[in-house]
From Swiss-Prot:
Induction: Induced by brassinolide. It is found in: Cell membrane. This is Proton pump-interactor BIP131. The chain crosses the membrane at residues 589-609. It is a single-pass membrane protein. Residues 374-572 are annotated as: Disordered. Keywords: Cell membrane, Coiled coil, Membrane, Transmembrane, Transmembrane helix. Residues 374-387, 448-516 have a biased composition (Basic and acidic residues). Belongs to the plant proton pump-interactor protein family. PANTHER family: PROTON PUMP-INTERACTOR 1, RNA-BINDING PROTEIN YLMH-RELATED. Its main location: membrane. The keyword Transport does not apply. GO terms for cellular component: plasma membrane.
Length: 621
């Protein structure tokens, strides 16, 4: 058990905490303040505060109490020291969580810098876009001004055009002048005076002459209007030239405005692209912030766990601070009472709780090792090993998940067992693997464990990070899916090849059946040779059909027996007959081909007759 000592006088309290003092000595300087000088013992004279030696001070002391003061009474109290303890696994997790948090913070800062760069780029584009927008606005104002200027001229031209159209509409069906009207009436009278026309024709001409005489006033009026319109031709030409000139100016302004608008469109497209990138970076920043907050929460949880494990140490620090305050105030009885209560409380917990004893033993290991003591507090023997292994930090458990999954992947990628391997060979091959697996826990247990008093739950395997485990599972699923797709593709290819071979065989079979039917039809006048050839062909077809039929799955041993039985038979093999060249006469296929050629010639002749003789005759009629 490790304790801290405390010494206290009536005017001060001194406490010792291990090698360091728990309480600071506080000397009473009332006498020095009253005299205003510092006393130096062991010298022959007394030096004042300003460095001069006083003659009055060289005189012998007047009182014996000043010469031989009473020794100060010192009170010593001992408190049980509670050390802080850092769990190696928890410390490794804290370091790993801190690294992850720093990585997340750096990643977020990189995204934030990229976002700031994109925003500055967007502001630069906007600064380039503002003068172009102002220039476009000026061009719009110029175009609108010219359009306002050309509007009254277009109205006047429209007025002239409407008057001309109205005059043309009124003069539709009328003569353009009086001379033309008189000439037309004269021509009609000449036709009437001609004796060869009929009475009806003469009446019609007389009626037409009357109608023309009735339109004389309208013709005169239209002629006057036309003369008036001719007077405004110069004015219309001037207005038209003005409109044309203004239109040319508008076209030039529109051309310049279109160039500015093209630049504006390019910049707007750039702004839209930058806005999309900014939105994507903003989403990434939100996700990075969420990841950073999650990592920081995990780090805080681990810190809370560490602080929760060191609750007794924090209580000890609080008690030490209160003892320091009481000793500074000189309250000896309060310090004594507090010391008694704390010691009784500690001993009660020590006697009643085994977990408390184990926790305390773990906490003082570092202190015992620094003072070269053994686990039970005695001096360490020369041949005794130090207990420094207790404080070593275990390596992080996140480095081990990758090799743990390799055997599973290798087992998946390993080829299937061959058919010639017997079960006995498989058992013999599996035996060394089982022996190696059985030796692995022995090797792990052979490692010297210094924590003999710790509970066995600390010997559990290091935990695998859930994120990495999920990633490895996802990779395994992807590989499984790839293998399944490859298997399906191979199966589909095999099925397609089988279907193609089956279709080819069926086509060959149908072709052979057609040839056989044709030979039977044409072989009505054949002799014995043709009959023998037909029989041989039939036999060959039957043999080939038997060969094309899918053979039933038969083992190798049965095939060997079948071959042995066949070799023992005395009957000749049918292969010589099957491979014999088929004899086919010329007349078996020449007659159908000749009939087909004759039919084609007749059809071609009918088509030519219809195209060149029948159709022209029908169109001429």
């Amino acid at each position: 058990m490790e304790a801290t000592g405390a010494e206290a006088t009536l005017s001060q309290v001194t406490a010792v905490d291990g090698e360091d003092n728990l309480f600071q000595d506080k000397e009473s300087r009332a006498t020095a303040k009253e005299r205003g000088e510092a006393a130096v013992f062991g010298l022959e004279n007394i030096v004042t505060a300003n460095g001069a030696t006083s003659a009055a001070d060289l005189a012998p002391p007047k009182d014996v109490v000043d010469e031989w003061p009473e020794p100060k009474q010192t009170h010593t109290f001992f408190f049980v020291r509670i050390c802080s303890y850092e769990d190696p696994s928890l410390k490794a997790k804290l370091e790993q969580a801190d690294k992850e948090c720093q990585k997340k913070i750096q990643a977020r800062s990189h995204i934030f810098e990229a976002l700031r760069t994109k925003r500055s780029e967007r502001s630069n584009i906007i600064s380039e876009l503002k003068p172009l927008a102002a220039e476009n606005k000026q061009y719009n104002e110029v175009v609108s001004g010219k359009l306002k200027e050309i509007e009254p001229l277009q109205k006047s031209l429209g007025k002239f055009r409407s008057e001309n159209n109205a005059m043309r509409a009124q003069g539709a069906g009328l003569c353009s002048s009086i001379e033309e009207l008189d000439q037309l009436i004269k021509s009609l009278n000449d036709r009437i005076s001609h004796e060869s026309i009929s009475l009806d024709e003469e009446k019609r001409l007389v009626k037409e002459i009357k109608q023309l005489n009735g339109t004389r006033s309208k013709v005169i009026e239209n002629a006057a209007k036309r003369a008036k319109m001719q007077d405004t031709v110069v004015e219309r030409g001037t207005i038209h030239d003005q409109v044309k000139q203004i239109g040319v100016g508008i076209d030039e302004v529109k051309r310049d405005r279109q160039a500015v608008r093209d630049k504006i469109k390019v910049l707007e497209d750039q702004i839209h692209a930058v806005d999309g990138e900014i939105a994507a970076l903003q989403d990434d920043l939100t996700a990075a912030t969420a990841r950073k907050d999650k990592a920081f929460e995990a780090l805080n949880e681990l810190r809370k766990t560490r602080d929760l494990n060191n609750t007794s140490f924090h209580q000890y620090r609080t008690i030490s601070n209160s003892v320091r305050d009481l000793s500074a105030r000189g309250e000896v009885e309060a310090v004594q009472q507090l010391c008694q209560n704390e010691v009784e409380k500690f001993m009660a917990q020590w006697c009643s709780s085994k977990s408390f004893r184990e926790d305390y033993e773990k906490r003082i290991l570092v202190s015992l090792n620094s003072r070269q003591l053994s686990r039970d507090g005695r001096m360490r023997n020369p041949d005794e090993k130090p207990i420094v292994l207790e404080t070593q930090v275990a390596p992080p458990a996140e480095q081990e998940p990758a090799p743990l999954k390799k055997p599973a992947k290798q087992a998946k990628e390993a080829p299937a067992p061959r058919a010639d391997v017997t079960p006995k060979d498989e058992i013999r091959a599996k035996a060394p693997a089982k022996a190696a697996k059985a030796k692995q826990p022995l090797d792990i247990d052979d490692i010297p464990d210094v924590h003999d008093d710790e509970p066995p739950k600390e010997k559990t395997k290091p935990k695998v990070d859930e994120a990495k485990l999920k990633e490895m599972k996802r990779q395994e699923e992807i590989e499984k899916n790839k293998l399944a797709l490859e298997r399906k593709k191979k199966q589909a290819e095999k099925q397609a090849m089988k279907a193609a071979a089956r279709a080819e065989k069926e086509a060959e079979k149908k072709l052979k059946e057609k040839e056989k039917k044709a030979r039977k039809r044409s072989a009505t006048a054949g002799g014995a040779e043709s009959e023998e050839a037909a029989e041989s062909d039939a036999k060959s077809d039957e043999a080939e059909a038997q060969e094309e039929e899918p053979a039933a799955p038969v083992t190798i041993k049965k095939n060997a027996r079948h071959r042995s039985t066949v070799t023992k038979t005395k009957t000749p093999l049918p292969k010589a007959v099957l491979k014999r060249k088929k004899s086919q006469a010329f007349w078996s296929w020449g007659a159908p081909m000749a009939a087909l050629a004759a039919a084609l010639v007749a059809l071609l002749g009918a088509l030519v007759y219809y195209q060149y003789y029948y159709l022209p005759a029908s169109t001429s009629n």
